[in-house]
Curated annotation (Swiss-Prot):
Organism: Pongo abelii (Sumatran orangutan)
Pfam family, one: Laminin_G_2
Domain EGF-like: 554-591, 964-1002
Matching PROSITE patterns: EGF_3, FA58C_1, FA58C_2, FA58C_3, FIBRINOGEN_C_2, LAM_G_DOMAIN
Self-association state and partner proteins as the record states: Interacts (via C-terminus) with KCNA2.
Membrane topology per record: Single-pass type I membrane protein
PANTHER family with a match to the protein in the record: CONTACTIN-ASSOCIATED PROTEIN-LIKE 2, PIKACHURIN-LIKE PROTEIN
Descriptive protein name: Contactin-associated protein-like 2
Glycosylation sites: N289, N346, N363, N379, N436, N506, N507, N546, N630, N735, N1116, N1198
Function statement: Required for gap junction formation. Required, with CNTNAP1, for radial and longitudinal organization of myelinated axons. Plays a role in the formation of functional distinct domains critical for saltatory conduction of nerve impulses in myelinated nerve fibers. Demarcates the juxtaparanodal region of the axo-glial junction.
Residues bearing PTM Phosphoserine: S1303, S1306
Secretion signal, residue range per the UniProt entry: 1-27
Length: 1331
């Protein structure tokens, strides 16, 4: 089969236009005539009927609106729920509205009613709206007219109005009018054997576009509606399977290749109700719209072909027998079709005119044959009593039922002569029979059969019992029938109860095992006699309560499926439930993502660098993706990887063709776009190694190589350059190998050259494809590498606006959240009230507000009356701290949560309006004269879309973009003495006065000391001139330059060593004062103080275990005058006191030594004894008051000039785990998924790289992995030490820090460095030269 061009977005748009036009053409009888004519006022009295009337003057013929004939309207003899008024239009009409009025000048009117409709006066269908059997609001007096426009028109000959409620001071009184217009359509009846073919004129039909429309009704759950196929494997089939509509399509498959074109889509449910259903199939290439009863489903076919090739014919009603297995295994359609239209050809008209030749088997007729079955509809309070034949020795009952409930009573009957009773029920989706026996020792016989019988399909039950024998058969399957030969005596009773038991409802002592049945039954047979339900309806014989005869009003609450993201829908009679397992979403309808929207959000929850799932648009359509979050800097890097990060050799053998290198990312392009759009900065490294392989062909040629970015746009600049500048980095910085070219590779040298750099114009990223040329010549070689996409910052997370006064507000377009709406944001305020946001409709609305200092309210109205949910906080919310609000409303429930307070939930009513219809603009901050919000709002997200508060505030008078005061809420995240600094977008932690590093000042900074190594930190800064040098006298401190005397100090550090004795820390002075921390030969720790006033230093010896055991140990020693508090590891703090004669000041501190003491002058004997050979091990997070000597040595800080090092200092954290924020419990941690293994999680675009964070691990695997990790770590450490020793004088410091104009080598470089998004081309003609 020949391939055709793919259909793009235009195809989908065209299908939508065609669908709209076709739907209008189908539902409207004329483009010039509005379907709004009164249909009742002109009808004769004989067209009206009713359940009963008080008298002739109250007969239904007087029930015409605004008429006063008779008693002024219809009133039944009894005002109860079994009354109805019926109108026969004479033929089918299209109905668009209904109006009611009470009985003239009386106290009789209906306040609520239902509308039923039918083509035949049988098999009634209730009017549905918003997925429910609709109850129309009626009148409030006898003379006012209340009209309701139908949400969707219906086609019927008969209309029946059933009063549900009426004026309590009167009785039922009614006058009606129905509005619409005439309707006519050709109807064809299919008997299950006949097939109607439409044969193609040229015996073949090749189409790129198809439009097929028809209506059908049937009482069968299986049957082929239409079918066509071609010899090349193409086919199209529309059929019923289990009362659902299935469209199967194949535009072509490749028998020898991987192209598999079969596509199958299922929609609808309960289509065997013998009511009309409309179907429209629209195809444009591979784009398909399938519309069933106004519900459209869009999809694309599998494979790569666009044309549908059919041979000879397309058939309606079945598949003609062809000898193929598919033609004999499928049932033909049995029922009626009308208005069959195939690509503009009216098939029904051709059939009526006998232009088509049906198959010889079966009969084709042009009137719809109605079924003989009469259904009966049960609710939770229903029962149906029918008489039986008394004292028979054979108990026989059969019926069909359909339901969604797994449990319910089906049949109950007492045996005569007090022999017992029989109960047939549905228990856990199985049919069970329980025979209670009173005349034998065996008290009960139980048998059951079937499974999954609550699937909404019709199921047949047959039960027969006689002496010592019983048999239960389900769905006619005799092979699996259940039998019992238990002792049993049978004498039938006189009453059979179906669906419920009257005595049970009256709380009698005769109880049954299951609650009342909710569903439908038909074809009820008792004692081998078919029950006449029309006679039962007239209560002769039999009785009933709350049943609807000749109607099956079962509703499939899973169609349409409100469970999003592939959630599985299950249902009972009046509700549905979504199972969201393994979807990545949660909530009543699987609407809310369990993942954070960005790495920035994970950072502020205290997480560290690792792989994480993020969901950039939350509840939006994109879905989650796995990224690496690098949190080692102030701003978090989000890293998205692909499959081409290693250097790839590019080979081409054809000078006329380029080599195309495609990059496959771990996410979709839409997901990546969401990341780049919200990021503050993005970059991607790209490198091209070349040997006789030109790159951009500068300065004037057409590029040999280019890259493709977002939206499939080609770009002709390289890393280090910018849009519109056809140069490489060396061309911008004017340091190319050959100055005549703007890229190193363009010089076409035979030696290897390189052009590389970062692409940083984020609107063009990511790189999705690189097209390489000029690699086909003799000696040409090229190697390409592209780094991962790296993005920094999250503008959405900190997108904020300040509301300076209560009368100010921001406005946005109308919020679209008809059936599912979620809203989340942060706020901070000092006022106790204010409206956060509000959106109004004609009657509907949605509003979030701060009602008091401790109350947040979420209120809305979808047409059922206002609903309000309130969350009350135990502490004030107007504390100028950030608080988070999450509100959600869907067809199942509404919820509100503030911070981590318990979520408040309000269930939606099972019946009523479900759509939130809004029309006004969305107002943020208050509107309409209400008390507006005064404070700050940020990160406002509605249905996955972040509202740009900052940009709207910039163009709105009186507003301020952004918020301040982030440290008031997040300052506690800065640990270990880190200082919180306010930023325009968020905050950062200043760790300069701590011994820690990292985003939250919680990363240890330490180093490994080899034997003989030492570090000295001079408290006095080095001399800066000759005068300073000459003025210094050894051991005679200059009071202006020396460190001040100390009355208190604090020392904190961690160490690990296996060698003792050694000096850990020593602080000298310009006097004889000193402070030392050392490890004695026994491995115990000693602290020595000499502050003067005593003959010997004061020693603190610890009695703890050996501290030279290779494990990390922490020391925290604090002195205030003579009081010393020492804390080691996890042991309790211990207080010590200096002798009374001791001085309280540490005079003139001079230097701090780590590892070894190198000091002139007299040194304490103990220190001198333990000073050789020196400390060997690891020291970390060393801090003396506000001084961090190790950090000053390893980081470029203001204190680095005070440090002198002997030896090579190797950075290490000494095996200590970085401190983090307190971890959340698994119950509240949204990414803690014990049930979801990352290796098996079936998420889109997941290549399996990296691992999502896991809290649960396999213990055996952990032990084995730990042993392996220790071995590998030992080997790596050894290699690191060897390499550092060999190359200790060859280290260089690299930075990607942007250079300013002062350091730029050219104007191009300065512009690029200062504005990476600069797009103007810079060439020689635009440069200025100084002459």
């Amino acid at each position: 089969m020949l391939a055709a061009p793919r259909a793009g977005c235009g195809a989908a748009l065209l299908l939508w236009i065609v669908s709209s036009c076709l739907c209008r053409a189908w539902t409207a009888p004329s483009t010039s005539q509005k379907c709004d004519e009164p249909l009742v006022s002109g009808l004769p009295h004989g067209a009206f009927s009713s359940s009963s009337s008080i008298s002739g003057s109250y007969s239904p013929g007087y029930a015409k609106i605004n008429k006063r004939g008779g008693a002024g309207g219809w009133s039944p003899s009894d005002s109860d729920h079994y009354q109805w008024l019926q109108v026969d239009f004479g033929n089918r009409k299209q109905i668009s509205a209904i109006a009611t009025q009470g009985r003239y000048s009386s106290s009789d009117w209906v306040t609520q009613y239902r509308m039923l409709y039918s083509d035949t006066g049988r098999n009634w269908k209730p009017y549905h709206q918003d997925g429910n059997i609709w109850a129309f609001p009626g009148n409030i007096n006898s003379d006012g007219v209340v009209r309701h426009e139908l949400q969707h028109p219906v086609i019927a000959r008969y209309v029946r109005v059933v009063p549900l409620d009426w004026n309590g001071e009167g009785r039922i009184g009614l006058r009606i009018e129905v509005y619409g217009c005439s309707y006519w359509a050709d109807v064809i009846n299919f008997d299950g054997h006949v097939v109607l073919p439409y044969r193609f004129r040229n015996k073949k039909m090749k189409t790129l576009k198809d439009v097929i429309a028809l209506k059908f009704k049937t009482s069968e759950s299986e049957g082929v509606i239409l079918h066509g196929e071609g010899q090349q494997g193409d086919y199209i089939t529309l059929e019923l399977k289990k009362a659902k509509l299935v469209l199967s399509l194949n535009l072509g498959s490749n028998q020898l290749g991987p192209i598999y074109g079969h596509t199958s889509v299922m929609t609808g449910s309960l289509l065997d109700d013998h009511h009309w259903h409309s179907v429209i199939i629209e195809r444009q290439g591979r784009s398909i719209n399938l519309t069933l009863d106004r519900s459209m489903q869009h999809f694309r076919t599998n494979g790569e072909f666009d044309y549908l090739d059919l041979d000879y014919e397309i058939t309606f009603g079945g598949i003609p027998f062809s000898g193929k297995p598919s033609s004999s295994s499928r049932k033909n359609f049995k029922g009626c079709m009308e208005s069959i239209n195939y690509n503009g050809i009216n098939i029904t008209v051709l059939a009526r005119r006998k232009k088509l030749e049906p198959s010889n088997v079966g009969n084709l007729s042009f009137s719809c044959v109605e079924p003989y079955t009469v259904p009966v509809f049960f609710n939770a309070t229903s029962y149906l009593e029918v008489p039986g034949r008394l004292n028979q020795d054979l108990f026989s009952v059969s019926f069909q039922f359909r339901t969604w409930n797994p449990n319910g009573l089906l049949v109950f009957s007492h045996f005569a002569d007090n022999l017992g009773n029989v109960e047939i029920d549905l228990t856990e989706s199985k049919v069970g029979v329980h025979i209670n026996i009173t005349q034998t020792k065996m008290s009960q016989i139980d048998i059951s059969s079937g499974s999954g019988l609550n699937d909404g399909q019709w199921h047949e039950v047959r039960f027969l019992a006689k002496e010592n024998f019983a048999i239960l058969t389900i769905d006619g399957d005799e092979a699996s029938a259940v039998r019992t030969n238990s002792p049993l005596q049978v004498k039938t009773g006189e009453k059979y109860f179906f669906g419920g038991f009257l005595n049970q409802m009256n709380n009698s002592s005769h109880s049954v095992l299951q609650p009342s049945f909710q569903g439908c039954m038909q074809l009820i047979q008792v004692d081998d006699q078919l029950v006449n339900l029309y006679e039962v309806a007239q209560r002769k014989p039999g009785s009933f309560a709350n049943v609807s005869i000749d109607m099956c009003a079962i509703i499939d609450r899973c169609v349409p499926n409100h469970c999003e993201r592939g959630g599985k829908c299950s249902q009972t009679w009046d509700s549905f439930k979504c199972t969201c397992d393994e979807t990545g979403y949660t909530g009543a309808t699987c609407h809310n993502s369990i993942y954070e929207p960005s790495c920035e959000a994970y950072k502020h929850l205290g997480q560290t660098s690792n792989y994480y799932w993020i969901d950039p648009d939350g509840s939006g359509p994109l879905g989650p993706l796995k990224v690496y979050c690098n949190m080692t800097e102030d701003k978090v890097w989000t890293i998205v990887s692909h499959d081409l990060q290693m250097q790839t050799t590019v080979v081409s053998y054809n000078p006329e063709k380029h080599s195309v290198i495609q990059l496959v990312y771990s996410a979709s392009m839409d997901q990546i776009s969401a990341i780049t759009d919200s990021a503050e900065y993005c970059e991607q490294y790209i490198s091209y190694f070349c040997k006789m392989s030109r790159l951009l062909n500068t300065p004037d040629g057409s590029p040999y190589t280019w890259w493709v970015g977002k939206a499939n746009e080609k770009h002709y600049y390289w890393g280090g350059s910018g849009p519109g500048i056809q140069k490489c980095a060396c061309g911008i910085e004017r340091n190319c190998t050959d100055p005549k070219y703007y890229c190193n590779c363009d010089a076409d040298y035979k030696q290897w050259r390189k052009d590389a750099g970062f692409l940083s114009y984020k609107d063009h990223l990511p790189v999705s494809q690189v097209v390489v040329g000029d690699t086909d010549r003799q000696g040409s070689e090229a190697k390409l590498s592209v780094g991962p996409l790296r993005c920094q910052g999250d503008r959405n997370y900190w997108n904020a606006a300040s509301f300076p006064n209560p009368s100010s507000y921001l406005h946005f377009s109308t919020f679209q959240g008809e059936t599912s709406a979620d809203i989340s944001f942060y706020f901070k305020t000092l006022t106790p009230w204010g409206v956060f946001l509000e959106n109004m409709g004609k009657e509907d609305f949605i509003k979030l507000e701060l009602k008091s200092a401790t109350e947040v309210s979420f209120s809305f109205d979808v047409g059922n009356g206002p609903v309000e949910i309130v969350v009350r906080s135990p502490t004030p919310l107007n504390d100028d701290q950030w608080h988070r609000i999450t509100a959600e409303r869907n067809v199942k429930q509404a919820s509100l949560q503030v911070d981590r307070l318990p979520q408040q939930i309000r269930k939606a009513p099972t019946e009523g309006h479900t759509r939130l219809e809004l029309y006004s603009q969305l107002f943020v901050g208050g509107a309409g004269g209400q008390q507006g919000f005064l404070g700050c709002i940020r990160s406002l997200r509605m249905n996955g879309v972040t509202l740009d508060l900052e940009e709207r505030a910039k163009v709105t008078s009186g507003f301020i973009s952004g918020c301040s005061g982030h440290c008031t809420s997040y300052g506690t995240n800065c640990e270990n003495g880190g200082k919180c600094l306010e930023r325009y977008h968020g905050y950062s932690c200043d760790c300069s006065n701590t011994a820690y590093d990292g985003t939250f000042c919680n990363k240890d900074v330490g180093a490994f000391f080899e034997e003989g190594m030492w570090l000295r930190y001079n408290f006095q800064a080095p001399a800066t001139n000759a005068r300073d040098s000459s003025s210094r006298v050894e051991n005679a401190p200059d009071q202006q330059n020396s460190h001040p005397d100390l009355a208190q100090e604090e020392i904190r550090f961690s160490f690990s060593t296996t060698k003792a004795p050694c000096i850990l820390l020593y602080i000298s002075s310009f006097t004889t004062d000193f402070l030392a921390v050392l490890v004695k030969p026994t491995g115990s720790l000693q602290i020595r103080y000499n502050l003067g006033g005593t003959r010997e230093p004061y020693n603190i010896d610890t009695d703890h275990r050996n501290m030279a055991n290779g494990q990390p140990h922490s020391v925290n020693n604090t002195r205030h005058e003579k009081t010393i508090i020492l804390k080691l590891d996890h042991y309790p703090s211990v207080s010590y006191h200096l002798p009374s004669s001791s001085d309280t000041l540490f005079n003139s501190p001079k230097s701090l030594f780590l590892g070894k003491v190198i000091e002139t002058g007299k040194i304490d004997q103990e220190i001198h004894k333990y000073n050789t050979p020196g400390f060997t091990g690891c020291l970390s997070r060393v801090q003396f008051n506000q001084i961090a000597p190790l950090k000053a040595a390893l980081r470029q800080t203001n204190a680095s000039a005070h440090v002198h090092i002997q030896g090579e200092l190797v950075e290490s954290n000494c095996g200590a785990s970085p401190l983090t924020l307190s971890p959340m419990s698994s119950a509240t941690d949204p990414w803690h998924l014990d049930h979801l293994d990352s290796a098996s999680a079936d998420f889109p675009y997941n290549p399996g790289q990296g691992q999502a964070i896991r809290n649960g691990v396999n213990r055996n695997s952990a032990i084995i992995g730990g042993v392996i990790a220790v071995v590998i770590f030992t080997i790596l450490c050894t290699l690191v030490f060897l390499i550092r020793y060999m190359f200790r004088h060859k280290g260089t410091y690299h930075t990607n820090e942007a250079k300013g104009a002062e350091s730029a080598e050219s104007a191009d470089a300065a512009i690029m460095n200062n504005d990476p998004n600069f797009t103007e081309t810079i060439d020689e003609s635009k440069k200025e030269w100084l002459i």
